[in-house]
Amino acid sequence: DFRGLIARPAVNEGDAVKAGAPLFHDKTFEQIKFTSPVSGIVVNVNRGERRTITEVIVRRDGDAVEQLQVADPAGGRDAVLATLLESGLFPFLVQRPLARLADPGVTPRDIFVAAMDTAPLAPATELLLQGREEHFAVGVRALGALTSGSVHVASAPGTELPDLSATANAVVHRFEGPHPADKGGRLAP
């Protein structure tokens, strides 16, 4: 799922982990952590060719959560970047071209957010955001702190998006068409 990743384990079999605790990190960018989605015991660290980590299996045994400091987007790029790296959310930022892990040391010119899904039978964006509108707006504001340019939010025509006026550098674009109209290559200039 993460092109260019060379994983280095942060846990061993038998270790107890909390949800949000690091399981492994990237060899190239050691500050990029991949965290556990659940609390439990590490049952297996499976390896593939050339001893690369293919999966880390955690048997769930509770609801313990790693406590993280959440940065306010107004705190600037460094505060937001530190939160994304510590929480394990940074790996979901993709660097173009080639859809590789983003380099945390590089300030992106622009950031593109696909707030739409053109895949067959995909749910409507409004349903996914229902009750989470404020979280989406704060997320866009946080992404705005990471870039020196704009945060381009792409959505389908007629889609109700949360108010993004608090993010000065957010720009909403409307796209339509057959799948894959929502993919990054189509969004970027």
Language model regions located:
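Alpha-helix N-cap/helix-initiation motif
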Residues: I6, F29-Q31, L129
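Short histidine-centered loop motifs in beta-beta connectors
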Residues: I6-A16
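Structured core elements
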Residues: R8-A10, F24, K33, I57, ...
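Short hydrophobic beta/alpha edge segments that flank linear recognition/processing sites
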Residues: G14-I32, N46, T54-R60
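Short alpha-helical basic/polar micro-motif
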Residues: D15-A19, V38, E134-R141
